[in-house]
Amino acid sequence: MAKTYKRRRYYRSKGRWSANIKNIDDSQTLTGPTNTTVGNSVDLCLNPLQDSLTVSQTYTVKNIELSTFMETENNAYVEDIEHYIMYVPQGMNLTTEYNYEHPEYIMAYYFQGNPATDNTSPGYRLKLKTRMARRLQTGDRIIYFWKAKKELSSDIDVKIRGLVRWWTKAN
């Protein structure tokens, strides 16, 4: 008679992904001479630094979808607009050249070129998404980073409004 063996199967539980959404409402006054490169960043998702009051846990971020509207005031406009979703490790300094200094951290990008046809009510719509995933350690963050060329010598007020959605899973 043949011997039978009973095998035990072990199952590993899958991580559960949760959806997150955030409202973006940011404004900045751009100063400087004509043909200056200006830019700004908005934190999309952030893993805070761990201190004596908070405990930070590493987690994975994926499927980031960004929908924004950029509006300039003072009858002014900006040209050669570059949009990025970028990863920023803890302690990294942000400059207007961050995308060229660390191209390995670019998750998604879009070049808008010269969108201004008239400067009475310039507004720039943008939808940007990435399926790339990043594991965020303590102090890391994902940002929406934009930069543009300032065409006028006067100050320009820029407002960015929109929504961002992403998925997270604890590691």
What kind of feature is each model-predicted range?
Residues 2-171:
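Capsid-like jelly-roll
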